[in-house]
C-alpha cells in the first residue's frame, strides 16, 4: 500500500512513516522542510500544503492519506485551504480514503471530510504528550512560568505511542466506518499537576497579558478544549491506550527536562543534557551535495553499515568496540548503536563547530563497518579543534580514550572539509571556542550530579513498570515499555557523551598541570568495580565457612547445593546478584547473557578466585598540589560516568527481559521459531512487524554468521579490506607492545577469551581478549593479567584494573592473533610489553580459543 503523509515533519508524521515503512508500505511525505531524520526509503516533497500542484504530486498513486498538517487556532490557510487542496487532489488522483488528525477545534474540517464523498476517519486526539514530543506542546510547557488562571482546569492527554498506533490502524483497516473517534488516555490531569511535574511555577497573569503573549494565548486555547467521551474508542474500536494520563505526564517530563521555551523557540540549558529526540539519517547527502558511500568492498558490508563522507575518512575501533563487540545483533543496532549516534548529536549541539563539520559530527561520530563499532577520528580532530590554544592532535592523544594505534593513518584524505581561511575569522573562532569550552566544562560539571540522579530515578521507574506483573502486560503495554526502555538506553549514551567530553577535558588539563599522563584514583564509590567487590566479598565469606570451601571445590552445579548446605552463603550470592546481576560479558549486546541469567558463572568465578594469588595493592597516584583540585573534579566525573554506565546497562537488562517476553509470546503465536528471534528485529520493527518475519530473521542470522568471518582493520582511512583471518604467531623471545595501564611484571599462560568462553579462563592465566567491558572484570580477580587488542587508558575495564592493581595492557594490536594460546608470557603492566617466554608444549593440554581470527 502507498500512503501519503501530510505534515510529515511533525511528531505524528515522522512516527507514522517509521511504522508504515517497517510494515513494508510505501510512503511519500509532504511538508515545508524535510526532517534530517527522514529515511531514504521514503519519498519526500518539500512544499507547503497550500501548494496545490505539490499536493497533487504527493497524492498521485496513493491508496490512503494521513492528513497530519494542521495548525493551532483557526488558521484557514492551513486547516481549511490546505485540506481543500488535499481533498481535491484525492478526487483527481483516485485516492479513496483519508485519516485526519483532528481535535475539538476542527469541526469545519471534519464537515469538509463528511461532505467529500470519500472514506474518512477523523481521530480527535487529546493533547499529545510523550518523551519524543518536540513541537509546540514541548515549547509551551517548557516556558519558565505558566499562568495560574486555569490551574485547576481538567485537561485530557494521550501518549504519542497510542496516537500513532491508532492512526496506523485507521489507515490500514479499511472496514472501519467513516466518522470521528475520540482518543484520550484514561484519567485526567489539571494544569496545576502538569506544572508541578515539570517543575514550572504558576503565577497569576491577567487576561490582557495572556492575549498579548503568543505562548500564553496558545495555552489559553488549550484551556478551552472540550472534554471528550471515549466510549466509541473502547466499545466500537476495541482500543485501550497503553498509557494512562499520569504516565503520559511522567513520560513528557523527559521531553521538557533540560529545556526552556522562550518566544517561539525551545533551548537546551547549558548545564543539563537534554533528551535527544530525533537522529539525522546517516545516508543523506551533505548540505553541499556530497553523497556518502559504503567504505567496505563489495559483499563485505552489512545491512546496518554506515556510508561515509570522503572528507571525513579515518575511523578507529579502539575504545568503542569495548561497548559492543561485533558482529552485533540487529536489535543492538537499534539500541546501542542508536544511543551512540544520539551521543554524537549531543556532542555536535554542545561544540557547535557549524556547517558540514557540525553535521558530520551529529551523523557519524560513531560508524558501523561489518556490524562492528568504530569512532570517527577525523570528526574527533574537529571536536578537539574547539579547545582553544591547543593542537587537536594533542587533545585527542591526551584524552585517555585512544591508544597509539590511532597514529598509524592520516586524519585526512584527498578531499578536505572547508576551513576558516582568513586570520580574522580564525581569531573570532578562537574567541568563540573559549566561550564554548568554558560553558561546557563549567556547565556540564555543575549539572552532572543532577543529570545522573535523574537518570538513576528514570531507570528505577522503568524497572518498576516493567517487572510489575511482566507476564500479564497486554501486548500494547509491553510494546510501549520496550520503546521506553530503548529510549532510556539511548539517553544513557547521551549522558555518556557528556562524560566523554568532561573526562577528556580533565585529562588534558591534568596532563598540562602534571607534565605527564596522570589518572587520579576514582575512590571507593566506583560503581563499575562492584563486580570485583562482589567476588571479593563472596571469597571472604567462603573462607570463613569450610562447608562452602568444600562445595566450591566440587565439580558441576553448585548453587542448589549451597542453598541446602550453606544457606547463609547462598543468600549472600543472591544479594550480590541483586546488585550486579544485570552485568556480564558483552553486556550491551542485546542477545548477551548476564550474571542473573547464569548465576553459576558468578559462583564458578568465586571458586577460581579462591585458588588465585591476590593482586598487590595498587600504588596511590602522586598528584602535584597544583593539580589536586582538577584531579578531584576528574575523579568525581569518572565516578559519575560509571554510575551512568551502570544504570544504562541496567536499562539494557530490563529491555532484554521485555524483548524475551515478547519473543516468547510471538513464538507461542507461531511468528518466531525461537524467542531469541526477537533479537534479529530492530526494536522499531517489533511494534510494526514486517510482512515476512521468519524470512527476515533467517536472512539476518545468516548475515551475522557471514560477517563473523569478515573483520575490518582496527583503523583505516577512506576504505577498508578485511583483515587476514590468520597470522603468524609470535615465537619464543618475541615481544608484543601495547599501552600499560597498571601493575608490574607477571607470568602466566595465554588464554584467548571471548564473551562466550569467559568460563574457560583458569586461575593464573593471562586473559587475552579483543576487548573487555566491565562485565569481564569479575574474572580479573583470578587472571594473572589482562591484555586487550583495543581500548584506551580511560576505558571502563582499564579504570577498574587500575583501581584494584590488576596488571593490564590495552591497545596491544593483534594480541588474539599473535599470542599463541597456552604460551607462557611475561606481561609488564607498566611498560605495556608482552614477552613470549616459551610456547605451549606439543603434548600439553590445548587451550580453547586457539583460532587466530580477531
Curated annotation (Swiss-Prot):
- Fetch the SUPFAM superfamilies from UniProt: NAD(P)-binding Rossmann-fold domains, Phosphohistidine domain
- Origin species, per record, is Mycobacterium tuberculosis (strain ATCC 25618 / H37Rv)
One Pfam family assigned to this protein is PEP-utilizers
Q: Name one GO molecular function term.
A: transferase activity, transferring phosphorus-containing groups
CC terms in the record's Gene Ontology section: peptidoglycan-based cell wall
Q: Which InterPro entries match?
A: Epimerase_deHydtase, NAD(P)-bd_dom_sf, PEP-util_enz_mobile_dom, PEP_Utilizing_Enz, Phosphohistidine_dom_sf
Under PANTHER family, the record lists: PHOSPHOENOLPYRUVATE SYNTHASE-RELATED, PPDK_N DOMAIN-CONTAINING PROTEIN
Q: Which family does it belong to?
A: Belongs to the PEP-utilizing enzyme family.
Superkingdom is Bacteria
This chain belongs to the protein called Uncharacterized protein Rv2047c
Amino acid at each position: 500500500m502507498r500512503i501519503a503523509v501530510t505534515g510529515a515533519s511533525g511528531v505524528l508524521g515522522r512516527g507514522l512513516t517509521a511504522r508504515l515503512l517497517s510494515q513494508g508500505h510505501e510512503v511519500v511525505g509532504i511538508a515545508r522542510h524535510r526532517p534530517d531524520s527522514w529515511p531514504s526509503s521514503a519519498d519526500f516533497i518539500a512544499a507547503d500544503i497550500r501548494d496545490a500542484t505539490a499536493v497533487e504530486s504527493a497524492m498521485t498513486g496513493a491508496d490512503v492519506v494521513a492528513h497530519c498538517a494542521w495548525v493551532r487556532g483557526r488558521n484557514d490557510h492551513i486547516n481549511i485551504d490546505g485540506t481543500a487542496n488535499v481533498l481535491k487532489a484525492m478526487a483527481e488522483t483516485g485516492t479513496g480514503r483519508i485519516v485526519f488528525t483532528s481535535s475539538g477545534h476542527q469541526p469545519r474540517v471534519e464537515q469538509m471530510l463528511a461532505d467529500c464523498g470519500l472514506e474518512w476517519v477523523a481521530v480527535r486526539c487529546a493533547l499529545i504528550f510523550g518523551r519524543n514530543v518536540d513541537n509546540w506542546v514541548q515549547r509551551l510547557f517548557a516556558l519558565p512560568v505558566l499562568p495560574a488562571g486555569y490551574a485547576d482546569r481538567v485537561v485530557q492527554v494521550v501518549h504519542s505511542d497510542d496516537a500513532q498506533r491508532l492512526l496506523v490502524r485507521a489507515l490500514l483497516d479499511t472496514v472501519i466506518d467513516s466518522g470521528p473517534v475520540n482518543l484520550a488516555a484514561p484519567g485526567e490531569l489539571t494544569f496545576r499537576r502538569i506544572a508541578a511535574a515539570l517543575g514550572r511555577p504558576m503565577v497569576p497573569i491577567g487576561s490582557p497579558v495572556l492575549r498579548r503573549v503568543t505562548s500564553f494565548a496558545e495555552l489559553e486555547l488549550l484551556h478551552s478544549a472540550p472534554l471528550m467521551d471515549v466510549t466509541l474508542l473502547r466499545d466500537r474500536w476495541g482500543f485501550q491506550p497503553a498509557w494512562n494520563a499520569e504516565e503520559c505526564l511522567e513520560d513528557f517530563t523527559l521531553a521538557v527536562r533540560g529545556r526552556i521555551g522562550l518566544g517561539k523557540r525551545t533551548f537546551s540549558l547549558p548545564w543539563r543534557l537534554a533528551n535527544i529526540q530525533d537522529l539525522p539519517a546517516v545516508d543523506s547527502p551533505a548540505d553541499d551535495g556530497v553523497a556518502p558511500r559504503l567504505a567496505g568492498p563489495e559483499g563485505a558490508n552489512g545491512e546496518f553499515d554506515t556510508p561515509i563522507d570522503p572528507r571525513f575518512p579515518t575511523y578507529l575501533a579502539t575504545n568503542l568496540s569495548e561497548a559492543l563487540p561485533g558482529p552485533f545483533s540487529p536489535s543492538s543496532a537499534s539500541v546501542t548503536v542508536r544511543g551512540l549516534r544520539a551521543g554524537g548529536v549531543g556532542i555536535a549541539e554542545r561544540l557547535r563547530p557549524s556547517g558540514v563539520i557540525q553535521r558530520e559530527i551529529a551523523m557519524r561520530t560513531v560508524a558501523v563497518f561489518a556490524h562492528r563499532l568504530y569512532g570517527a577520528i577525523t570528526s574527533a580532530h574537529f571536536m578537539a579543534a574547539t579547545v582553544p590554544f591547543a593542537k587537536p592532535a594533542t587533545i585527542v592523544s591526551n584524552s585517555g580514550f585512544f591508544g597509539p594505534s590511532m597514529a598509524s593513518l592520516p586524519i585526512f584524505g584527498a578531499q578536505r572539509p572547508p576551513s576558516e581561511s582568513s586570520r580574522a575569522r580564525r581569531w573570532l573562532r578562537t574567541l568563540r571556542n573559549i566561550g564554548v569550552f568554558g560553558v561546557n566544562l563549567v556547565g556540564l560539571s555543575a549539572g552532572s550530579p543532577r543529570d545522573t540522579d535523574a537518570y538513576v530515578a528514570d531507570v528505577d521507574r522503568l524497572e518498576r513498570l516493567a517487572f510489575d506483573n511482566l507476564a500479564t502486560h497486554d501486548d500494547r503495554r509491553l510494546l510501549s515499555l520496550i520503546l521506553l526502555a530503548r529510549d532510556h538506553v539511548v539517553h544513557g549514551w547521551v549522558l555518556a557523551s557528556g562524560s566523554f567530553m568532561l573526562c577528556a577535558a580533565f585529562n588534558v588539563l591534568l596532563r598540562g598541570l602534571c607534565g605527564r599522563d596522570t589518572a587520579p584514583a576514582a575512590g571507593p564509590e566506583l560503581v563499575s568495580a562492584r563486580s570485583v567487590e562482589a567476588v571479593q566479598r563472596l571469597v571472604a565469606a567462603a573462607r570463613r565457612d569450610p562447608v562452602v570451601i568444600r562445595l566450591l571445590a566440587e565439580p558441576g552445579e553448585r548453587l542448589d547445593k549451597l542453598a541446602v548446605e550453606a544457606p547463609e552463603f547462598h543468600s549472600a550470592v543472591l544479594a550480590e546478584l541483586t546488585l550486579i546481576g544485570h552485568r556480564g560479558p558483552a553486556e550491551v549486546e542485546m542477545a548477551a547473557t548476564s550474571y542473573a541469567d547464569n548465576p553459576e558463572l558468578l559462583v564458578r568465578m568465586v571458586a577460581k578466585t579462591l585458588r588465585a594469588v591476590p593482586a598487590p595493592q595498587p600504588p596511590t597516584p602522586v598528584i602535584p598540589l597544583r593539580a589536586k583540585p582538577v584531579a578531584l573534579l576528574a575523579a568525581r566525573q569518572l565516578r559519575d560516568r560509571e554510575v551512568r554506565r551502570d544504570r544504562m546497562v541496567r536499562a539494557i537488562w530490563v529491555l532484554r527481559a521485555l524483548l524475551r517476553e515478547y519473543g516468547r509470546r510471538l513464538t507461542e503465536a507461531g511468528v518466531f521459531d525461537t524467542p531469541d528471534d526477537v533479537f534479529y528485529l530492530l526494536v522499531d520493527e517489533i511494534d510494526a512487524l514486517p510482512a515476512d518475519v521468519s524470512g527476515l530473521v533467517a536472512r539476518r542470522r545468516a548475515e551475522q554468521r557471514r560477517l563473523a568471518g569478515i573483520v575490518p582493520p582496527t583503523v583505516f582511512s577512506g576504505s577498508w579490506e578485511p583483515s587476514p583471518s590468520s597470522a603468524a604467531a609470535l615465537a619464543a623471545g618475541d615481544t608484543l607492545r601495547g599501552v600499560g595501564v597498571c601493575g608490574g611484571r607477571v607470568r602466566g599462560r595465554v588464554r584467548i577469551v571471548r564473551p562466550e568462553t569467559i568460563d574457560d579462563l583458569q586461575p593464573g592465566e593471562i586473559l587475552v581478549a579483543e576487548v573487555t567491558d566491565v562485565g569481564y572484570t569479575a574474572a580479573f580477580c583470578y587472571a594473572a593479567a589482562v591484555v586487550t587488542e583495543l581500548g584506551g587508558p580511560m576505558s571502563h575495564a582499564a579504570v577498574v584494573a587500575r583501581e584494584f592493581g590488576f596488571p593490564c595492557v590495552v591497545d596491544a594490536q593483534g594480541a588474539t592473533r599473535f599470542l599463541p594460546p597456552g604460551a607462557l608470557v611475561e606481561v609488564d603492566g607498566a611498560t605495556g610489553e608482552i614477552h613470549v617466554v616459551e610456547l605451549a608444549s606439543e603434548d600439553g593440554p590445548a587451550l580453547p580459543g586457539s583460532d587466530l581470527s580477531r
